[in-house]
């Protein structure tokens, strides 16, 4: 086990540590503001840089279709049978944004094949620790077997991990480990970096890759986003998109039963 040394410590910041300073503006109307992002690999434009999380309590076909109608993206969660997930993907009406999550072990190859058969064009390799050899092998398999799929992978917490996933072939990287509302990775394992610091670290590597003429995946801020201000801070820090879970949970578009007391 690696031992901690003084040089291993560094200051990190979370959303609550930062406030943006108001600046002079020549924007007459908020309607003039353009937050859209063009996803080259999907040949589609997202009017809003927001993705609904592939959580069992957040995204199934209803949420995915709603996100698409609002200009965002929804990723169908993987915590169901292959046949049921396949059915959910088939219910997505926008053929440009059929997205779902898979794991990296077990039935993931069989699952992915079944999803591609019903028009999947975006896959999220969904694991707690994205900087891992199994993720590397999964990305290698997906890129070689389904080269036209838009590939999201993660989660990672450092610029070096972002760089590795870039080299492995990810098109987008989910950034932050263990800071979501129900994610306990940071607490249970003692590992993680606050989302804002993770974004900044990854963005610095992204700039370096672009300066060197290399492909640089989209950065997806994922975890600990509690309000619209956190979304703004994420984008200001260098994220291209944000992934929301708790902010969307409990809405009528989410799966689950309504309980009344």
What residues fall within each predicted segment?
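An N-cap/entry alpha-helix motif that binds or orients negatively charged groups
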Residues: 1-50
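Alpha/beta enzyme core
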Residues: 2-7, 12, 18, 59-260
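N-terminal cofactor/phosphate-binding cores enriched in small/glycine residues
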Residues: 32-39, 43, 47-78
């Amino acid at each position: 086990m690696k031992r901690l040394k003084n040089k291993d410590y560094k200051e990190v910041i979370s959303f609550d540590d930062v406030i943006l300073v108001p600046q002079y503006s020549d924007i007459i109307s908020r309607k003039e503001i353009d937050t859209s992002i063009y996803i080259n690999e999907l040949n589609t434009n997202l009017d809003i840089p927001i993705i609904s999380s592939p959580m069992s309590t957040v995204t199934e076909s209803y949420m995915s279709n709603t996100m698409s109608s609002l200009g965002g993206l929804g990723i169908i969660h993987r915590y169901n049978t292959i046949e049921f997930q396949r059915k959910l993907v088939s219910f997505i009406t926008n053929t440009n944004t059929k997205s779902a999550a898979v794991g990296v072990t077990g039935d993931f190859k069989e699952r992915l094949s079944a999803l591609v058969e019903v028009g999947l064009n975006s896959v999220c390799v969904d694991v707690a620790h994205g900087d891992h050899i199994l993720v590397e092998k999964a990305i290698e398999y997906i890129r070689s077997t389904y080269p036209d799929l838009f590939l999201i992978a993660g989660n990672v917490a450092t610029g070096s991990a972002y760089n590795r996933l870039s080299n492995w072939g990810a098109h987008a990287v989910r950034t932050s480990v263990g800071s979501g509302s129900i994610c306990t990775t940071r607490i249970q394992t003692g590992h993680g970096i606050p989302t804002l610091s993770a974004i900044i670290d990854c963005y610095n590597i992204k700039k370096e890759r672009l300066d060197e003429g290399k492909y640089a995946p989209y950065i997806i801020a994922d975890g600990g986003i509690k309000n619209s201000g956190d979304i703004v801070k994420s984008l200001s820090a260098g994220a291209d998109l944000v992934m929301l879970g708790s902010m969307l949970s409990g809405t009528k578009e989410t799966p689950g039963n309504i309980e009344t007391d």
